UniProtKB/Swiss-Prot annotation:
Molecular function, one GO term: cysteine-type endopeptidase inhibitor activity involved in apoptotic process
Gene that encodes the chain: Naip2
The protein's role, per its UniProt record: Sensor component of the NLRC4 inflammasome that specifically recognizes and binds type III secretion system (T3SS) rod proteins such as S.typhimurium (Salmonella) PrgJ and B.thailandensis BsaK from pathogenic bacteria. Association of pathogenic bacteria proteins drives in turn drive assembly and activation of the NLRC4 inflammasome, promoting caspase-1 activation, cytokine production and macrophage pyroptosis. The NLRC4 inflammasome is activated as part of the innate immune response to a range of intracellular bacteria.
Domain spans labelled NACHT: 508-802
Species per Swiss-Prot/TrEMBL record: Mus musculus (Mouse)
Protein name: Baculoviral IAP repeat-containing protein 1b
Gene Ontology terms: biological process: apoptotic process; cellular response to estrogen stimulus; defense response to bacterium; detection of bacterium; inflammatory response; innate immune response; negative regulation of apoptotic process; pyroptotic inflammatory response
């Protein structure tokens, strides 16, 4: 066996073409590349993992236990994997076969684990049915006694003789030493790993590593003479008391079981179904409507069992259903025809010796007659598959991995058929019975037979659900293993239990608690069925099992009559006296399963006594009780079992079985919850899953929101179930909704009795339990919760809609009060996004206009935008919302325009959907139209139905934006340039404490490289989502109204494909004007030439950055007759053809040329500009210019010039330029970058620009005091100035205080950049001026590189600075050679200063050397600051060197 696992590890492909196709379609990614990359990573992990036969995982129950921490968001259940031989390795999500060592990391929706196992390792000996020691999950240690020792008993008195019998001891049991076994009195029987005591004859098997043969011997056969001769009574007692599980149980209880079946060895294809047992399949045909024993045998041989409906049969392995059987039909052939992938069939057919025997039973006898009225005339209708069998017909079908699930046990076919085949040492009822004893035994055996007959009927397994739900097969829906935790009453520690562990620990009085619909009833019925089937050895110890529903009994009823009425049916009868005698005799061998418990007071006396005085009867009781009813019964319990939330993999398992014909819908369902991880817990009970299935049956088309559909279906279920109490139900929903709504807006999810009373919720009302849960454990007062936080939101949405729709003004006011708690777009799009989705899913003609109006107003209210930073406990409601909040906040900080666009689209979509669903579009139109006026929206909104109904609203919009982002990702940061900029900088010498102020550039580069790799992987796999122009406005033909302005933004995109070109042609033709902004998208323009040529008269703006303009591109641009704005920046080559023909753009208003590295850019402009009279913005960035004449002429021709930017390191003669600029009285912005003019010539004309708003002279130097004073005086005339970048130089330093005083007279100033020239006195002047009321609108104060300011000067500045309510950015950074080491008192002053700046979001302080204590002070200030969520402190340099640490 070891060699099998040690084979050279091949690369395992866990996916197939179907999966690749499905994922590519649904996720719009290149799934093949993603899956191949995952396959490579999995292979590397697989190579490192241990291989070989794992004897410790032979036990299916142990394998099942390994899945306790397994990810619940998977397609396979732990039961399916454990049954297929897999256990969870703990390495990622890897599962491994205990036998062949196959390791799988992925689960597949279309294939079960046994199918994948067989496909990838068909030679696995476990799959081939060989004896590899597999122990079924319900199997037991005790085996049937063997006869072989009777003649050799004397010989085996000698230990050596016993040891010799172990010569062929199986390899998988080597963890238990033959020498220890023989010393304990055991002899190897030669069958699997079964041993038998030579003295008492007791047989034990399923030995695992660590087992103690003496302990096992003492537990199961404590009266053995050999055992008693070797061990003292105290030792035996200690063995028994320390044994885990099986309290009060010995081997006698299993050996003498009345329900015991002879079970074959477990096979992998059994698929966790009891009907893998032929005998049990045969039993299901008791009510078969046809008369032919031979036909039944053929059906059974083909793996089929009878469902109890018409003549529908189902395969225990694949779950396939067939019906309408006729004479001569061949079950095995039809089974193969309709379900060719059935693992059971494949396994049978792989064994040549099976086929002849199988075929001899294939054909149904010709003489088969029917006792039903089924019509078999239509040959084509014979054997409908499960798709063709109506759900109501298939409701009792037992699925392949059903709740009624059990594997065939590891028993040999040749085990003794009789129950009394043991030696004289075994424990059998005495044959010398008195008459009264014989009477009770006879009655008990008869009762056992009747109970087994009742429990094995399909009608017992099936649960009736109301009306529309009755179309569902509850065996499918409620059949998966529930998740159970055990809570011992005397111990607070909780532990997860598998179902086998639960069965092993059944004793005394226990309860199983859970929510409504959690599966309590089905769990009890499952136990009863498994016991009756005889296929669950763990339950063999019970001779009688009584499943009783307590909902229909009265306190005065006798227990015997209850049993007769509920379980024995017509003709069944047992007296109270006889029942009492049986219980008294059997004691621990009687199990009561009590369902629908509501309280001790409602119980008959007999049951009351069984519970409260269990020490008298010593029976076992398992009581199903709703969570809120546990307190009353807790004093009598030994252990409480609690059913936890229904795992998501169980939900998938149910849907896969019921909707195997529509597997893509199931795939979409999984993807929806994969993308919405916060929703994965909403299927918390099987009843919720039933609601999903009902909705799917009623609505075959996909639902946009799976959670909304689920909650609505659940509420519909409640209304159907409680039709007779419609008004009380409505009142309960309203009061619970009020509680939910109040809790939602106070972040409260746990409530006490006072909260319920205040909301009008009756905590004792049964209907309340359908919506809320009560928790009493370890609490002085009970705590109430809704069935889930999302369900609370849903009920809150129902209540809000009810309030806003009310005729009562106070209700409407209350609803509006709650609605206004959503007072910012951030809240609307993050923590309350799901809530608003639920609100919009409840159409209301009265509520819709109110909700729509409120939400649309949020977009533009500046006050509400400021509310985004308030401190709220977001995590309580939606932990996943925190990241979303940060992303939205970051978007708002980086680009308020993009933020507004995003929330506008999303809130508009919610509002329009609400208005349409509630049929209130007309009522909502005034506020919708007001919202649309002057708005820029994304192209996607035009696909909404509203724009098809009202295309005229396009005229109200400012523009529509379309963004195309491709995969041509470009590195934005050039680290070589950064390193070059530090070439002349000497590393500073600092103390070790301050070394953290410098971060090595290689760390940043490495980190960025890793992120780039991740981004690149994502971009490579991502498919561009095609633009959808098939709905809404785009369905109109012809288009009655056009898009007023189309903004096209193209980033990192290559040439457009044919599909995109067709879309753009359609969109361009529907636009009045078009503006382009292209970056890093070479080749794109040429590729959309056909679209541009059709709409060239509409293109008004073209901005191109970091792309290569070919000759063809330039020619194409020159054909745009109405171009008004042209921008070219950061191109490698000079587009001379385009620039030389600028005069052809007759309407050009804006020209921006940003080619910093190119000299003499102006030289390629045309010589004359006779047609350019409309220029409003002129921005030129070049390295040097030797001739300004063309620029001067262009300005002369531009009487409406508003913006002038010029960056140039050298100008040969600037006098003409200054002269012509002086004539431009309408200038709003002037920026000179680079030291490109004589200062005085500009200062002389500065007073002319009275409308100036932006003046940027940061790169200019004013060396003399006279020029600087004149500049300061000129500032006083610029009353509209908003942004000032003060020049540098010694002259400016000398008059700095004068400049500050002049700036204080500028009422509109928002940005002040004053670098390099301030000292202690002048910087203090800024602080004093602000404190006196100046700079009230200042948002950005940049004081960088002012190295003349001392630490004392800074400290005085910090201590005085105040009264700047709008300041957002303060920068006091210095150059590296001028690092400043400050004292604690200065840090304290800085902290106090920051605290006085309520709007501050950025503090720049590079080259300020801070130690850990300083940083702690700064961080403490940040945490207490009003902008704590947004405030960023920049204090670390990123440098290509390490500082010198002084010793």
């Amino acid at each position: 066996m070891a060699a099998q696992g040690e084979a050279v590890e091949e690369i395992i492909c866990e996916f197939d073409d179907d999966l690749v196709s499905e994922l590519s379609t649904l996720l719009r990614v290149d799934a093949l590349s993603v899956l191949k990359r995952q396959q490579e990573e999995d292979h590397k992990t697989r190579m490192k993992m241990k291989k070989g036969f794992n004897s410790q995982m032979r036990s299916e129950a142990k394998r099942l236990k390994t899945f306790e921490t397994y990810d619940k968001f998977r397609s396979w259940t732990p039961q399916e994997m454990a049954a297929a031989g897999f256990y969870h390795t703990g390495v990622k999500l890897g599962v491994q076969c205990f036998c062949c060592s196959l390791i799988l990391f992925s689960t597949r929706l279309r294939k079960l684990p046994i199918e994948n196992h067989k496909k990838l390792r068909p030679e696995c000996e476990f799959l081939l049915g060989k004896d590899v020691g597999n122990i079924g999950k319900y199997d037991i240690r005790v085996k049937s006694p063997e006869k072989m020792l009777r003649g050799d008993k004397a010989r085996y008195h000698e230990e050596e003789a016993r040891l010799e019998s172990f010569e062929d001891w199986p390899f998988y049991a080597h963890g238990t030493s033959p020498r220890v076994l023989s010393a304990a009195g055991f002899v190897f029987t030669g069958k699997r790993d079964t041993v038998q005591c030579f003295s008492c004859g007791g047989c034990l098997g399923n030995w695992e590593e660590g087992d103690d043969p003496w302990k096992e011997h003492a537990k199961w056969f404590p009266k053995c003479e050999f055992l008693q001769s070797k061990k003292s009574p105290e030792e035996i007692t200690q063995y028994v008391q320390s044994y885990e599980g099986f309290l009060h149980v010995t081997g006698e209880h299993f050996v003498n079981s009345w329900v015991r079946r002879e079970l074959p060895m477990v096979s992998a294809y059994c698929n966790d179904s009891v009907f893998a047992n032929e005998e049990l399949r045969m039993d299901t045909f008791k009510d078969w409507p046809h008369e032919s024993p031979g036909a039944v045998e053929a059906l059974v041989k083909a793996g089929l069992f009878y469902t109890g409906k018409r003549d529908i049969v189902q395969c225990f392995s694949c779950g396939g259903c067939m019906e309408k059987w006729a004479e001569g039909d061949n079950p095995i052939e039809d089974h193969t025809k309709f379900f060719p992938n059935c693992v059971f069939l494949q396994t049978l057919k792989s064994s040549a010796e099976v086929i002849p025997a199988l075929q001899s039973h294939c054909a149904l006898p010709e003489a088969m007659e029917t006792t039903s009225e089924s019509n078999h005339d239509d040959a084509a209708a014979v054997h409908s598959t499960v798709v063709d069998v109506s759900p109501s017909e298939a409701q009792e079908l037992e699925p392949a991995s059903s709740l009624v699930s059990v594997l065939c046990r590891d028993q040999d076919h040749s085990e003794a058929q009789g129950r009394g085949c043991a030696s004289s040492g075994t424990y059998l009822p005495s044959t010398d019975l008195g008459q009264s004893e014989a009477q009770w035994l006879q009655e008990a055996r008869s009762l056992s037979e009747q109970l087994r007959d009742t429990y094995t009927k399909a009608t017992f397994r099936h649960m009736n659900l109301p009306e529309v739900y009755s179309s569902l097969g509850t065996d499918h829906l409620l059949s998966c293993d529930v998740s159970i935790i055990s809570k011992h009453i005397s111990q607070p520690v909780q532990g997860s239990l598998t179902i086998p562990e639960v069965f092993s620990n059944l004793n005394s009085v226990m309860c199983v608690e859970g929510e409504a619909g959690s599966g309590k009833t089905t769990f009890l019925k499952r136990i009863a069925f498994l016991w009756a089937s005889g296929c669950c050895p763990l339950l063999y110890r019970f001779q009688l099992v009584f499943y009783l529903s307590l909902s229909s009994i009265t306190p005065g009823q006798e227990l015997a009559k209850i049993i007769c009425a509920q379980l024995l049916g017509a003709g069944g009868c047992i007296s109270e006296v006889c029942l009492s005698s049986i219980i008294q005799q059997l004691q621990h061998q009687v199990l009561f399963l009590l369902d629908d418990y509501s309280g001790l007071a409602s119980l008959p006396q007999a049951l009351h006594t069984l519970i409260t005085k269990n020490y008298l009867s010593r029976t076992c009781l398992l009581i199903a009780v709703h969570t809120n009813k546990v307190r009353g019964i807790r004093p009598y319990l030994d252990t409480s079992l609690e059913i936890k939330e229904f795992p998501f993999y169980n939900t998938v398992s149910v849907l896969r079985k019921l909707f195997s014909h529509d597997i893509m819908r199931v795939r979409k369902f999984i993807n929806y919850f994969g993308f919405h991880e916060e929703l994965q817990g909403i299927h918390k009970t099987p009843l919720f899953v039933a609601a999903v299935c009902t909705d799917w049956f009623k609505n075959p088309s996909d639902q946009p929101f799976q959670d909304v559909a689920l909650f609505k279906a659940y509420m519909q279920y409640l209304s159907l179930k409680h039709k007779g109490a419609a008004k009380p139900l409505q009142a309960t929903v309203s009061s619970c909704g009020q509680l939910a709504l109040t809790g939602l807006f106070s972040s409260c999810f746990e409530f006490n009795s006072d909260n319920l009373a205040e909301a009008g919720v009756d905590e004792d009302e049964e209907l309340t339990t359908c919506l809320m849960s009560k928790f009493t454990a370890q609490r002085l007062r009970p705590v109430y919760r809704f069935l889930g936080p999302l369900f609370q939101e849903f009920l809150a949405a129902v209540r809000l809609t009810e309030l806003l729709s009310s005729d009562r003004q106070e209700d409407q006011d209350l609803g509006l009060y709650y609605l206004r708690q959503i007072n910012s777009p951030l809240k609307a799009m993050s923590i309350y996004h799901t809530f608003l989705k639920y609100v919009s899913s409840h159409p209301s003609s009265k509520a819709a206009p109110t909700v729509v109006s409120h939400l649309l107003q949020l977009v533009d209210e500046k006050e509400s935008l400021e509310n985004m930073s308030e401190n709220e406990d977001y995590m309580k409601l939606h932990p996943e919302a925190l990241l979303w909040i940060e992303c939205l906040r970051g978007l708002w900080q980086l680009s308020p325009e993009s933020f507004s666009l995003f929330i506008s689209e999303n809130l508009l979509r919610i509002c329009l959907n609400f208005a349409h669903e509630s049929n209130t579009v007309a009522a909502c139109s005034p506020v919708i139209l007001q919202f649309l006026r002057g708005r820029t929206l994304d192209l996607k909104v035009l696909s909404l139905q509203y724009f098809w109904d009202h295309p005229e609203t396009l005229l109200l919009l400012k523009s529509i934006k379309i963004s195309l982002n491709g995969n041509n990702w470009v590195q934005r940061i050039d680290f070589s340039l950064i390193e070059k900029s530090f070439e002349k900088v000497q590393p500073p010498t600092i103390d070790q404490d301050y070394a953290i102020a410098f971060q090595p550039i290689n760390e940043v580069q490495k980190n960025l490289s890793e992120k780039k790799h991740i981004i690149k992987k994502y971009e490579d796999m991502k498919h561009q989502i095609p633009l959808n122009i098939s709905t809404g406005y785009w369905k109109l033909s012809p288009k009655p109204y056009k898009i007023p302005k189309l903004e096209v933004q193209v980033t990192n995109t290559g040439p457009a494909d044919q599909a995109l070109l067709q879309v753009l042609m359609e969109v361009f033709s529907a636009s009045q004007s078009i503006e382009f902004r292209l970056s890093d998208s070479s080749g794109f323009l040429e590729s959309i030439r056909p679209a541009l040529e059709l709409s060239k008269a509409s293109v008004t703006k073209c901005s191109m950055s970091r792309l290569e303009l070919s000759r063809e591109d330039q020619k194409l641009l020159l054909t745009l007759p109405t171009l008004q704005s042209l921008e070219v920046s950061e191109t490698n080559q000079l587009p001379d053809q385009l620039f030389h023909n600028l005069h052809k753009f007759l309407g050009l208003k804006e020209l921006c040329v940003r080619l910093d590295s190119k000299p003499d850019v102006l030289s390629v402009l045309p010589g004359e500009f006779p047609n350019l009279h409309h220029m409003e913005k002129l921005s030129i960035r070049t390295s040097t210019e030797s001739d300004l004449s063309k620029l001067v002429k262009l300005i002369q021709n531009s009487p409406n010039l508003h913006v002038f930017h010029l960056k140039c390191n050298f100008l040969s003669n600037c006098e003409p330029l200054m002269t012509v600029l002086a004539s431009c009285k309408k200038l709003r912005e002037i920026e000179f970058s680079g030291r490109c003019f004589e200062a005085m010539t500009f200062v002389n004309i500065l007073p002319n620009f009275v409308f100036l708003k932006i003046l940027n002279l940061r790169d200019q130097q004013f060396p003399d005091k006279e020029t600087s004073e004149k500049f300061a005086q000129a500032l006083g005339s610029l009353r509209n100035l908003e942004k000032l970048f003060v020049p540098t130089g010694d002259g400016i330093h000398q008059v700095a205080k004068l400049i500050v005083r002049q700036c204080l007279q500028l009422p509109c100033l928002r940005v002040l950049v004053f670098a390099e020239t301030l000292d202690d006195d002048s910087v203090l002047e800024i602080a004093k001026g602000a404190t006196r009321g100046g700079f009230q609108k200042l948002e950005n104060l940049d004081l960088t590189l002012n190295h003349k300011i001392t630490e004392e000067g800074y400290r005085n500045f910090f201590q005085v600075l105040d009264n700047l309510p709008n300041l957002k950015n303060l920068d006091i950074s210095r150059h590296i050679p001028e690092c400043i080491q400050i004292q604690a008192i200065t840090v304290k002053a800085l902290g106090q200063c920051v605290s006085r700046l309520p709007s501050l979001t950025r503090l720049g302080m590079l080259s300020w050397l801070l130690d850990e204590e300083d940083i702690k002070v700064i961080n403490d200030v940040k945490e207490r600051h009003p902008q704590s969520k947004r405030l960023t402190v920049h204090w670390r340099w990123v440098v290509p060197f390490s500082p010198v640490i002084q010793k």
